[in-house]
Amino acid sequence: LIDPKLIEETIDVCLHEVMDVFYQKDLGLIVENLSASDNSLVDSFEGRSINPGHSLEAMWFIMDLGKRLGRPELIQRAVEIALRTIEYGWDKQYGGIFYFMDRLGHPQQQLEWDQKLWWVHIESAIAMIKGYQLTGNQKCLDWFEKLHQYMWEHFKDPEFPEWFGYLNRRGEVLLPLKGGKWKGCFH
């Protein structure tokens, strides 16, 4: 078995990296990449990249750790970051959550930046319902219901039970594939 002390140390390191290093307080968001030399923000495609799906996935992991460690303040902080992230990542024109965003609003390097992916929405729904379950925050439940409606209206195949994985910005099926390199049993 793994030494409990190693597990404890790993949890501490991961919490610090996510909540104190990659989370940028002035932005209220988690960034994907920082300078390797000093953990500062970098003005490049990679340095400006925000992936709302990764951030929301990380926040429900953090909520789980907060519960495991008996740290309600950690849960509350994760919920606040999750709410800020989903509000930032939500497409106000067509609905759904963008795949990638640029923290300065510049053009994206990723051509798929405005696609709506199933896993981003599922991870977001988990974060929202978990946030509601652990804190009773009504905003989390409201977002969960909004996500639930969007997912079942857009990702569901009306003929066969498996969801489509990739939608265009307008929420229309982009690829009729139901499985692939990224769409499998993990997501």
Task: Specify the residue positions occupied by each region the protein language model found.
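Glycan-recognition and catalytic cores of secretory/periplasmic carbohydrate-active enzymes
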Residues: 1-187
